[in-house]
């Protein structure tokens, strides 16, 4: 069993999603958004750090998965996003959580099957995979999709490692 916290970082809205993985089964534990309504960036970053720390304390995750920075057309936006990611990662590492990063295209490919999927498609698939009664809000859905991606990637890595080990032992040909 593992609990995974997914984070969709943003300087104004940071989505989070928490799921439990038992074997191949995924179950929803919680999701939402950390909203920063103040104008100055240092105060927003402090709120993101405090919010992520509170979520970690509440859910006690085993793994922390976060979206990688993409190259935005606006350099200022990319820098702010990078800073928001940074404080979220520091909150995780301060709690000794292993941090995993996934590109947005990889998340969409894993959850929807198309790397260029629309937000509504991600929301629908997250709802379906986690058997939710309604679509989660967009930022929370993205965070849940990041957590789901971590489950799939780590599960595939474990299967590959097991296959390599069996090959080395001469059990597979």
From Swiss-Prot:
Residues of the active site: 8, 67, 139
Primary residence: cytoplasm
Annotated signal sequence range: none
Role description: The RuvA-RuvB-RuvC complex processes Holliday junction (HJ) DNA during genetic recombination and DNA repair. Endonuclease that resolves HJ intermediates. Cleaves cruciform DNA by making single-stranded nicks across the HJ at symmetrical positions within the homologous arms, yielding a 5'-phosphate and a 3'-hydroxyl group; requires a central core of homology in the junction. The consensus cleavage sequence is 5'-(A/T)TT(C/G)-3'. Cleavage occurs on the 3'-side of the TT dinucleotide at the point of strand exchange.
CDD domains per UniProt: RuvC
Cofactor note: Binds 2 Mg(2+) ion per subunit.
GO cellular component, one term: cytoplasm
Localization in the cell: Cytoplasm
Family, as annotated: Belongs to the RuvC family.
Cofactor: Mg(2+)
Residues binding Mg(2+) 1, per UniProt: 8, 139
A GO molecular function held by the record: crossover junction DNA endonuclease activity
Name of this chain's protein: Crossover junction endodeoxyribonuclease RuvC
Gene encoding the protein: ruvC
């Amino acid at each position: 069993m593992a609990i995974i916290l997914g984070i969709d970082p943003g300087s104004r809205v940071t989505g989070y999603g928490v799921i439990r993985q038992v074997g191949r089964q995924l179950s929803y534990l919680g999701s939402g958004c950390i909203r920063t309504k103040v104008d100055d960036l240092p105060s927003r970053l402090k709120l993101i750090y405090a919010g992520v720390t509170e979520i970690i304390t509440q859910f006690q995750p085993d793994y922390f998965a976060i979206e990688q920075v993409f190259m935005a057309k606006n350099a200022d936006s990319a820098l702010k996003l990078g800073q928001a990611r940074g404080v979220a990662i520091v909150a995780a590492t301060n709690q000794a959580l292993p941090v995993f990063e996934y590109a947005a295209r990889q998340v969409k490919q894993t959850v929807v099957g198309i790397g260029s999927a629309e937000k509504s498609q991600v929301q629908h698939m997250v709802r379906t995979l986690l058997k939710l009664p309604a679509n989660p809000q967009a930022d929370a859905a993205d965070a849940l999709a990041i957590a789901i991606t971590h489950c799939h990637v780590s599960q595939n890595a474990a299967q590959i490692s097991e296959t390599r080990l069996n090959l080395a032992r001469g059990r597979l040909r």
